[in-house]
A protein has these predicted regions:
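An acidic, glycine-rich "communication" segment
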Residues: 113-137
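Residue-level marker for buried hydrophobic side chains located in beta-strands
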Residues: 172-174
Length: 201
């Protein structure tokens, strides 16, 4: 089963003034993974669940968006373990927004606060690949120092880093949310399909 599945991490959703904390994921991200031809396997924010992840061979991982990075949260600890596992098993990892930030930080990069990048659309510039002309933006932090062995493959028109890939590992990072487009972008679907098939993109 898992060879046709992609494991997807989830965000924290807080209710009742923080007294109740839930695992959360956008239904559209689930649909987006199905559009890639895979079954999404949702990963709860529980470090004990990593034992299950290690026992299975997924086609890939998606570190999803949502939540600013707090290095002490179980989510971040779990996502770091997933990145380490992906290096060992050579499993593709796609980082979406928060997920791309986690990848960058894992390789000693850091972030800086940015303005005008929440609920906006930005043009992409200096694209290495056939990305769309415009992408959505829902983040308060951008990359200040690029992590080791990463290269930038797309900038926004205001010179913010929007997409990165790793030179050694099969890691790809997007600062935008492909699942939040009203109609899923066909170019992104094609890029992601090839990526999880471990083809060169």
């Amino acid at each position: 089963m898992t060879k046709n599945s992609i494991a997807v991490t989830m965000r924290y959703d807080y209710f009742y003034n923080g007294k109740e904390v839930r695992n959360g994921i956008d239904f559209n991200l689930i649909n987006w993974v199905y559009n890639l031809g895979y079954t999404p396997h949702l990963v709860p924010n529980d470090i004990r669940y990593f034992k299950i992840i290690k026992k299975n061979k997924f086609a890939g991982f998606i570190l999803s968006g949502g939540n600013d990075i707090n290095i002490k949260t179980t989510r971040v600890l779990l996502e770091n373990k997933i990145l380490k596992l992906s290096i060992k098993d050579k499993t593709p990892v796609l980082g979406i927004c928060h997920g791309m930030q986690i990848m960058n930080r894992f390789e000693d990069g850091n972030l800086t606060r940015v303005s005008n990048h929440v609920q906006k659309y930005h043009k992409l510039c200096d694209n290495e690949f056939e990305y769309p002309n415009k992408v959505n933006s829902f983040h308060k932090y951008g990359i200040k120092r690029l992590g080791k062995n990463f290269e930038v493959i797309a900038y926004s028109n205001d010179n913010q880093i929007e997409a990165i890939k790793h030179r050694k590992h099969n890691w790809l990072g997007w600062m935008w949310h492909p699942e939040r487009d009203k109609i899923f972008n066909k170019k992104l679907i094609k890029i992601a399909k090839n990526f999880f098939k471990k083809k060169k993109i």
